Amino acid sequence: MEPWIPQWLPQPSGRPPAPSKDPDRGLWKDRYYQPIPHSWHNGERVHQRQDVGRSPQPQQDPREDLQEPHYAARSGEWRPPVSGVDYYEGGYPSQLYSRWSIEDLYQSYYSPALREEYAYGSYYYHGHPQQLQEERVPRQGSPYIWQEDHRDQKYLNDHQHENQNSPFGTNRETQLQSKSRNPYKDSPASNSGQERPEDLFMESPLTGAQKNKLSLMEESNLLWQHESGLTSSSYELSQYMADASELCDPMTSAVWSPVQAEDISAAGPKEPMKFYVPHMPVSFGPGGQLVCVSPSSPSDGQTALVELHSMEVILNDSEEQEEMRTFSGPLIREDVHKVDIMTFCQQKAAQSHKSETPGSRDSALLWQLLVLLCRQNGSMVGSDIAELLMQDWKKLEKYKRQPPVANLINLTDEDWPVLSSGTRDLLTGEILPSVETPAQILEKFTKLLYYGRKKEALEWAMKNHLWGHALFLASKMDPRTHSRVMSGFTSTLALNDPLQTLFQLMSGRIPQAATCCGDKQWGDWRPHLAVILSNQGGDPELYQRTIVAMGDTLAGKGLVEAAHFCYLMAHVPFGYYTVKTDYLALLGSSHSQEFLKSATTEAIQRTEIFEYCQMLGRPKSFIPSFQVYKLLYASRLADYGLTSQALHYCEPVGTALLSHGESSHPVLLVELIKLAERLKLSDPLVLERRRHRGDRDLEPDWCVHLRGHHRELQQKEAGDIGRPQSAQAVISEARKTPENTFYQDLSGPQGNSEAYGDRSALWPTLEQSGPAQLSPQQPRSYPTGGGSGQMGVPVPLYSVPETHLLGTSGSMAVTGAPGGTAWEEAQQIHLPPVSPETLQHPDGQKAISRPQVPLIPRARSISESSIVSVKEDEEEPPRRQIKIFLKYRPERKPEREGDTKSSGFGWFSWFRSKPTHNASPSGEEDSSDSPDSEEMPRAASLPQPSPSLSLTPSPDPQSLLGASAFSRDTGGDEVRGSVSGVGTAEGPGSGGLSGPEGVSTELCLNAGVLLPPPSVKGSVPLYNPSQVPQLSTVTSLNRPNRLAQRRYPTQS
């Protein structure tokens, strides 16, 4: 018997069990099964019919979904008889039926312990009961809890429709009466589709031959066990393990179940449970706490137990927390004494010396450098660093001279002869020992000089190693000879000799040690760097490039600490982790590896100490790229339960961000505010204030400053996009710094027509500006620093404000949509809007009314500035106009030659004319003075002016020609605003315009074109821009008008 099968009460061996009183249950009669009736929808009891003398009818296998014949036992097969023990004790043979029928046995029975029942997935199905509740012994915690009244009624009532529609409803009893499993359902015979005769229940009375075969079934099962290689004990163990695996696999049971999922009893749970075993949910709190919720049963009235654990206590023995606790951070200049930092660095250096890792010596050197910097308040001197490099240098290495190589001078491998070498015998070829003493060598050198043989004497001195005499003699000769002698002298030194490095550096080239250090054959890199730092002179850039090259070579060899030491000596700034081309991001850690391996705790602490040493000499010398690592270190402190220290780390980061002002990173600022918000209750001062004041929103002062700075950045960003600003403040700021407004990054919203509503406060109205009294003869003055304007570069007076449409009494169709190109160009200029005017083409075509957009201020020369007053720009900013929409007008060639010629010399004739302050009273006289006045329509009277700027066009197209930037109100006669010409405005009741109002407004199209002077009778006009169509209609802000520069040369 398998351990998971329900145990049956043993029956007395002397008598058979009493038959059940239930009429619907099948009875044992001569060890045959009676067919169990099924209830159909009409209430009749239908027995499945099967001919005893013939083969069973084909039935559908529930596992294969195919129609296979239910065949009787073959003649060659042997079935063991059912033993008496199985008959009397169990009531049914234990190994007679399929294992899958056991699953069908308990289909309609569920346990009140729904959690335990559902933990086995879809294993429990509805089935037909085969034993009474009192006839079995239930196990402790078993899901099989039988109910007597549920045995027949539940089966017949709940599954009436299912038995009707099931393809094997007539042979249902063959799948519901078995209690045992077939241990060989996964055997090769079962997998090949061959079913054993005993796998399916024999529903009709069996024949005599079948009785005999059934009696031999037990023997056949033992034979199968022997063939499969399983003993009885291992067979039972394998069955138990297989059954246990199937209990946790709901998909397997669902495949073989003839009962659909919707027919399962509604008492069971409908949704799958997330966990099959009891568990404990945990969560990490912001204050370094671990919150645990113990498992409970709310249905039984148990309340959940919430436990709070401190991460500082849990991780008290961890190495990472110990490393953070011993470091006295954050390192603030006013709170931490440098003696504590020096002690910490010395301990770290001693630990690095004890470890025998490859980079331990270089790591100890970095810690010793930090000690020296902390002692000297961040200052570095070359001789002090050289002493640090050579302090553990026990003895000088004996640098061996390398074998000679072919040089570019003599192209031979011959080396300079040594002192002990003698002359070679011509007969024998042997080298005779030299008998010359140093005195004799010097005497021969002197004799050669007696006779004026300088070259021979130089060669003799070089061969006999009289390098002092040779160098002095060569210095008085030609430079080529001196260079050759120096090369010969340095060639006698070893390549890895520090003297070779120094001499090469003094010769003005990067030493070979800078590109070869780090190899074992080359030797140590420290003496070379020491001799470079101690003898700095000449070209500082050459020395810096040499040290950086040495650092790059060491970094390529994997010596990161040594490379960073060189970078610090070359004053290389710290970079960012994401920029792989930067030299260093954290001191002693390579940023070319993974971030978690790069941003180690030791590297962050080492970099913070270096920043602290710099602040000892310069208080505000923060490392901008290091602030994000401080925030990361504060987060790690909070994770390890050190919340108070983490909150203290946020304060210097916030101080550094506030000191940088607008150059700070907004994302880092937001993350810092979030972390400080979570940790603010770790500050005891804040807790004390909350108790006394009762203010729950109280936070540290530096947090308040951070939030205010964040709001300022947001407001500035909103202002750049389209936030309304005061025009007067913008104009005054632009006048103070005209050279800076040109390089501002101007951006504004495009395509949002609703944003340009009634913003009358954005630009000053005409009442504020008043009628402008222009004096053309007043000399023009430029602000300081306006050299760019004199060179012809247009400098806008207004930097940020965008153009908008003011509310008008009428309506007007704007030619350019807000999302169009013309509107975008107008938005980039950011000049005040003015009223619309009409544009007159040169050929006299029909005037087209177009909305005016702000004018780009043009550049003026000194000659022009001597005549025109600066008040023109200061008092009448709305007067200037630019015609962006003329950009799409095709260019036209001049019709007459004389027009072009006269316009080219118009500026000279303008100088000869002497305009007066008096303007002509009407536009008729003004237009008569111009030779081209026939082509220009006269200005008509304007409507009544309104207090504010208006975009309402006049019904008469002729009245729009030459219109100024003002209109007439219906209730008053006073003219307000500024005239677009250079004349003065008329008084009340004036019906005409003064000055060159009749002149075509295309004069204002280009920023580099002069404004027309006041038209006086008898004066010569400047020129007509309509006659010069080759001029660019729109001048870019980034490029001056070259034609204007050639026509109006500047004077220095």
Swiss-Prot record:
<dbReference type="GO" id="GO:0000139">
    <property type="term" value="C:Golgi membrane"/>
</dbReference>
<dbReference type="Pfam" id="PF12931">
    <property type="entry name" value="TPR_Sec16"/>
</dbReference>
<keyword id="KW-0653">Protein transport</keyword>
<feature type="modified residue" description="Phosphoserine">
    <location>
        <position position="863"/>
    </location>
</feature>
<feature type="compositionally biased region" description="Low complexity">
    <location>
        <begin position="941"/>
        <end position="961"/>
    </location>
</feature>
<dbReference type="GO" id="GO:0012507">
    <property type="term" value="C:ER to Golgi transport vesicle membrane"/>
</dbReference>
<keyword id="KW-0333">Golgi apparatus</keyword>
<dbReference type="Pfam" id="PF12932">
    <property type="entry name" value="Sec16"/>
</dbReference>
<feature type="compositionally biased region" description="Acidic residues">
    <location>
        <begin position="923"/>
        <end position="934"/>
    </location>
</feature>
<feature type="compositionally biased region" description="Gly residues">
    <location>
        <begin position="984"/>
        <end position="995"/>
    </location>
</feature>
<feature type="compositionally biased region" description="Polar residues">
    <location>
        <begin position="739"/>
        <end position="753"/>
    </location>
</feature>
<feature type="region of interest" description="Disordered">
    <location>
        <begin position="836"/>
        <end position="857"/>
    </location>
</feature>
<feature type="modified residue" description="Phosphoserine">
    <location>
        <position position="187"/>
    </location>
</feature>
<dbReference type="GO" id="GO:0006888">
    <property type="term" value="P:endoplasmic reticulum to Golgi vesicle-mediated transport"/>
</dbReference>
<feature type="region of interest" description="Central conserved domain (CCD); required for localization to endoplasmic reticulum exit sites">
    <location>
        <begin position="271"/>
        <end position="718"/>
    </location>
</feature>
<comment type="subunit">
    <text>SEC16A and SEC16B are each present in multiple copies in a heteromeric complex. Interacts with TFG. Interacts with SEC13.</text>
</comment>
<keyword id="KW-0931">ER-Golgi transport</keyword>
<feature type="modified residue" description="Phosphoserine">
    <location>
        <position position="75"/>
    </location>
</feature>
<feature type="modified residue" description="Phosphoserine">
    <location>
        <position position="55"/>
    </location>
</feature>
<dbReference type="InterPro" id="IPR024340">
    <property type="entry name" value="Sec16_CCD"/>
</dbReference>
<feature type="region of interest" description="Disordered">
    <location>
        <begin position="1014"/>
        <end position="1052"/>
    </location>
</feature>
<dbReference type="GO" id="GO:0007031">
    <property type="term" value="P:peroxisome organization"/>
</dbReference>
<feature type="compositionally biased region" description="Basic and acidic residues">
    <location>
        <begin position="21"/>
        <end position="32"/>
    </location>
</feature>
<dbReference type="GO" id="GO:0007030">
    <property type="term" value="P:Golgi organization"/>
</dbReference>
<feature type="compositionally biased region" description="Polar residues">
    <location>
        <begin position="163"/>
        <end position="181"/>
    </location>
</feature>
<dbReference type="GO" id="GO:0005789">
    <property type="term" value="C:endoplasmic reticulum membrane"/>
</dbReference>
<comment type="similarity">
    <text>Belongs to the SEC16 family.</text>
</comment>
<keyword id="KW-0256">Endoplasmic reticulum</keyword>
<keyword id="KW-0813">Transport</keyword>
<feature type="modified residue" description="Phosphoserine">
    <location>
        <position position="166"/>
    </location>
</feature>
<dbReference type="GO" id="GO:0070971">
    <property type="term" value="C:endoplasmic reticulum exit site"/>
</dbReference>
<protein>
    <recommendedName>
        <fullName>Protein transport protein Sec16B</fullName>
    </recommendedName>
</protein>
<feature type="region of interest" description="Disordered">
    <location>
        <begin position="1"/>
        <end position="85"/>
    </location>
</feature>
<feature type="compositionally biased region" description="Polar residues">
    <location>
        <begin position="766"/>
        <end position="781"/>
    </location>
</feature>
<feature type="compositionally biased region" description="Basic and acidic residues">
    <location>
        <begin position="41"/>
        <end position="52"/>
    </location>
</feature>
<dbReference type="GO" id="GO:0015031">
    <property type="term" value="P:protein transport"/>
</dbReference>
<dbReference type="GO" id="GO:0070973">
    <property type="term" value="P:protein localization to endoplasmic reticulum exit site"/>
</dbReference>
<feature type="compositionally biased region" description="Polar residues">
    <location>
        <begin position="1024"/>
        <end position="1039"/>
    </location>
</feature>
<feature type="modified residue" description="Phosphoserine">
    <location>
        <position position="869"/>
    </location>
</feature>
<keyword id="KW-0597">Phosphoprotein</keyword>
<feature type="modified residue" description="Phosphoserine">
    <location>
        <position position="142"/>
    </location>
</feature>
<feature type="region of interest" description="Disordered">
    <location>
        <begin position="891"/>
        <end position="999"/>
    </location>
</feature>
